[in-house]
């Protein structure tokens, strides 16, 4: 039995924790909302994030980070991007005292504005300087609501260290979620992060009343943008974006009502403001954060990402959705295949 500390007990953290307990692991969920921790421990439910669902009874929750990390061989980060660095600093302090060197796994999908760093890079900075090998990223078509019901899916687990990727593959795989190893850590992370921006755009199209052709075209051109950023800035492998963490995650996030980013975009397409949407969503919309980092990269490195840039302008510069759509369709002719 492996002890796994799951940092973040929102919907995805709770579902992953329950799944890992299904696999026979000793799972402790860490979160900072006392009422959520109390409910998980008392009834193994998490009604704040997941209605009408129960966690595996061999899970427990705590608000004490040191308790969660004590004896953990694997630490799974399932936090909002904006919280990763501060929690990682606290993790480093505790690990330095204990001397423990657990494997770090990130299920967070985002890019940090300002630093423009991926989650694995933040964890390397704060916990394992110059030791990226001890970090694994998991990403793929996997909404918490579906995995909670043990619907079937497949997810990539990526690391620069093949043995660590295989360890995660063995620990996480079961009869309803299949994990595939991948050696392109940054590529897997870029796909998982930037598809949230494209999903906001897909939701906007639906909110504006556009049909399937428009959505398919958007997703395809969005994938081109994700690939361009991943290859040209982060040094990712182009083929990664044809996999589970690329097109797989993009499809489900751009088409499912379970996607927060898609739902946020739909409301914006219907005329609601970003502030209104974020206030009423009740959960994190990662694409709204990631698009800031993408915008910074586009400006600094002259990367051509017109869909992502249009979403940034709609969300943060107050431009009109209809105007941005007209601008997009009126751009100068370009070849389809280019990096």
From Swiss-Prot:
Keywords: Cytoplasm, Lipid biosynthesis, Lipid metabolism, NAD, NADP, Nucleotide-binding, Oxidoreductase, Phospholipid biosynthesis, Phospholipid metabolism. Pathway: Membrane lipid metabolism; glycerophospholipid metabolism. Its EC number is 1.1.1.94. It catalyses: sn-glycerol 3-phosphate + NAD(+) = dihydroxyacetone phosphate + NADH + H(+); sn-glycerol 3-phosphate + NADP(+) = dihydroxyacetone phosphate + NADPH + H(+). PANTHER family: GLYCEROL-3-PHOSPHATE DEHYDROGENASE, GLYCEROL-3-PHOSPHATE DEHYDROGENASE [NAD(+)] 2, CHLOROPLASTIC. The active site is at residue 195. GO terms for molecular function: glycerol-3-phosphate dehydrogenase [NAD(P)+] activity; NAD binding. Belongs to the NAD-dependent glycerol-3-phosphate dehydrogenase family. Its main location: cytoplasm. It comes from the Bacteria. Catalyzes the reduction of the glycolytic intermediate dihydroxyacetone phosphate (DHAP) to sn-glycerol 3-phosphate (G3P), the key precursor for phospholipid synthesis. InterPro entries: 6-PGluconate_DH-like_C_sf, 6PGD_dom2, G3P_DH_NAD-dep, G3P_DH_NAD-dep_C, G3P_DH_NAD-dep_N, NAD(P)-bd_dom_sf. Sn-glycerol 3-phosphate binds at residues 109, 140, 142, 195, 249, 259-261. One of its GO terms (cellular component) is cytosol. It holds the Pfam family NAD_Gly3P_dh_C. This is Glycerol-3-phosphate dehydrogenase [NAD(P)+]. NADPH binds at residues 11-12, 109, 144, 260, 284, 286. GO terms for biological process: carbohydrate metabolic process; glycerol-3-phosphate biosynthetic process; glycerol-3-phosphate catabolic process; glycerophospholipid metabolic process; phospholipid biosynthetic process. PROSITE patterns: NAD_G3PDH. It is found in: Cytoplasm.
């Amino acid at each position: 039995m492996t002890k796994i500390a799951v940092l973040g007990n929102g919907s995805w953290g709770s579902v992953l924790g329950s799944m890992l307990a299904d696999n026979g692991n000793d799972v402790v969920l860490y979160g900072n909302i006392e009422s959520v921790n109390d409910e998980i421990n008392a009834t193994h439910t998490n009604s704040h994030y997941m209605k009408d669902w129960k966690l595996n009874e061999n899970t427990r929750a705590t608000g004490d980070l040191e308790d969660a990390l004590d004896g953990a061989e694997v630490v799974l980060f399932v936090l909002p991007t904006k919280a990763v660095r501060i929690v990682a600093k606290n993790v480093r302090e505790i690990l330095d005292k204990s001397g423990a060197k657990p494997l770090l796994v990130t299920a967070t999908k985002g890019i940090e504005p300002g630093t423009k760093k991926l989650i694995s890079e933040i964890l390397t900075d704060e916990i394992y300087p110059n030791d990226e090998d001890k970090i694994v990223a998991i990403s793929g078509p996997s909404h918490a609501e579906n995995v909670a019901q043990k619907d079937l899916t497949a997810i990539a687990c990526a690391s620069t260290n093949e043995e660590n990727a295989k360890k995660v593959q063995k620990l996480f795989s079961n009869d309803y979620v299949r994990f595939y190893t991948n050696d392109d850590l940054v590529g897997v992370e870029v796909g998982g992060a930037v598809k949230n921006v494209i999903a906001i755009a897909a939701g906007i199209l639906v909110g504006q009343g556009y049909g399937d052709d428009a959505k398919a075209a958007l997703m395809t051109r969005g994938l081109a943008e994700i690939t361009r950023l991943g290859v040209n800035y982060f040094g990712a492998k182009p083929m990664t974006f044809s996999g589970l963490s690329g097109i797989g995650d993009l499809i489900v996030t751009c088409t499912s009502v379970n996607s927060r980013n898609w739902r946020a975009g739909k409301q914006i397409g219907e005329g609601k403001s970003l502030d209104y949407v974020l206030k009423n969503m009740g959960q994190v919309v990662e694409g709204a954060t990631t698009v800031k980092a993408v915008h910074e990269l586009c400006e600094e490195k002259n990367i051509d990402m017109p869909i992502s840039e249009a979403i940034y302008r709609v969300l943060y510069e107050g431009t009109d959705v209809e105007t941005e759509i007209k601008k997009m369709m009126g751009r100068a002719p370009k070849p389809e295949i280019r990096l």
